Amino acid sequence: MRESRASASFGSDRGSVDGTYRVAQAYPHYGLTVVGHSLGAGTAVILSLLLHAEYPTLSCCGFGTPGSLLDRKTASESGNWLTSVVLDNDIISRLGLGTLNHLREEVLRSITRAKLNKTYIMRTLVEELDADDVMYPAGEEPSSEFKNAVDSFLEHMRRKNESAGKLHELVLPGRVIALVKTSWGQMHQMRGCCESCFRGVCCCCRSKKAYVAQETTGDAFSEIVVSSSMALDHFPDRYAEELQTLSRKWEEVTRR
């Protein structure tokens, strides 16, 4: 009866700081770990910061944590009890005003360097093309009305950003663990619908990859990596799959 009342109380208070306080006080012998994925990871980090002063043994782990979340000082000081896990090219852990501005500039510059018709390029997005066949080398693209418009726009944005002052730098919080791809295995046998698929964009012909966990810092995620896996690497099932694989490998090593 007591257990059911406690569960009901927790359910009604779920999501509130006060509710978490009451549950923690009712079960003082329990440890408290706050976890989340994506936006939930960001929420878990903020909630943990609010609770940590009263519960110093609290720990927090975020998977695919949003990139621009805490200032550098707070992010560093929380490293003893807060961990951010990032899978390979996960775009969400690299998102920020600075990285988006940089990506916009790179995309516009790349478009001005295109040799081929843009409609043709869009039709061949999932094909692997030679960059020399598609783009002029940087600085060697011919002058055009579009290129001049892009140059003017980027110069305007640079002046605007300079007049606004330096951006307040925000980084990934806590200790950062990166799950890094170490090798590409053989491609699974492709079905007919995916014969032109580029490097496993489709789930039905995804390559088998090996990952290793490496401790790093938030500075390693200061640019958005444009790749075929940048969105897929954020999916919770991908995190679960690779973490389970690493856990099994660790168990095998420790048993030897």
Q: What is each model feature region?
A:
Residues 1-33, 46-256:
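Alpha/beta hydrolase fold serine-hydrolase catalytic domain that processes acyl esters and thioesters
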Residues 35-40, 44:
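Gly/Ala-rich beta-loop-alpha elbow adjacent to hydrolase catalytic centers
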